[in-house]
């Protein structure tokens, strides 16, 4: 988040709590009209299958077992979602946000395949395996890139994978949309000064990239100054950013607020 926004979750006023498995509800119940009156975003996986789980004639036992495994995870994910929605229905302080599959798969789906490609030499030593993994991660088929992402996470370890990916994160990373919505729910009102600092940070990156024409940067700098001075509002400067630099990753963030 800090690489993209220039400010961390802590600096936004958001605390990140890592809770395993079913522990969500035990902590989330604290956020209530009669308890802690602050917003809480629950972020977890829906675990939808990346393959067709229908067993057909001719499937080998290995294929059948693989399909059953994916189906089982999917059913647990659907049950998890239903349980969370039922538990906190009517509670305005809590909302749940789900990766369609898992974080690793959705991270690649969001457009971050290159980040995963960058860690392959750290995960595999065999050149043929690296080549196969590269082809799968670059595929548009979720069954291929999803399976490779899951294989890396399961074999290398999710914690170790997170550390490796963390070293590859840069300002051009695409934050998965479900995470952005979770951030926006937890912190729906961002002060103008914070937005100015975020956009100023992104503009400085553009000014230094040796690709973006400086006249375009200078023109947006005028709009940003007008925003700081109250001459245009957040929606106005958001639209100006999208118009001037449509490919900048900050637009992913701006559109959810």
Question: Where are the language model's segments positioned?
Answer:
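Acidic, divalent-metal-binding catalytic cores of TOPRIM
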Residues: 1-257
């Amino acid at each position: 988040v800090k690489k993209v926004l220039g400010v961390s979750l802590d600096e936004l006023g958001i605390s990140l709590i890592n809770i395993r498995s079913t522990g969500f509800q035990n902590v989330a119940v604290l956020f209530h009209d009669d308890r802690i009156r602050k917003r809480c975003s629950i972020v977890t996986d829906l675990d939808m299958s990346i393959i067709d789980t229908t067993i057909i004639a001719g499937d080998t036992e290995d294929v059948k077992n693989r399909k059953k495994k994916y189906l089982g995870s999917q059913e647990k994910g659907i049950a998890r979602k239903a349980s969370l929605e039922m538990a906190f229905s009517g509670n305005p302080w809590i909302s749940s946000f789900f990766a369609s599959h898992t974080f690793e798969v959705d991270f690649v789906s969001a457009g971050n395949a290159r980040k995963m490609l960058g860690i392959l030499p750290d995960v595999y030593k065999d050149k043929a395996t690296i080549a196969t993994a590269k082809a799968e991660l670059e595929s548009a088929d979720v069954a291929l890139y999803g399976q490779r992402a899951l294989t890396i996470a399961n074999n290398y370890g999710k914690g170790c994978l997170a550390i490796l990916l963390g070293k590859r994160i840069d300002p051009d990373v695409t934050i998965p949309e479900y995470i952005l919505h979770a951030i926006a729910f937890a912190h729906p009102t961002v002060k103008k000064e914070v937005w100015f600092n975020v956009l100023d940070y992104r503009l400085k990156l553009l000014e230094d990239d040796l690709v973006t024409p400086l006249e375009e940067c200078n023109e947006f700098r005028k709009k940003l100054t007008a925003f700081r001075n109250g001459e245009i509002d957040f929606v106005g400067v958001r639209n100006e950013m999208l118009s001037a630099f449509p490919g900048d990753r900050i637009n992913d963030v701006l559109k959810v607020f």
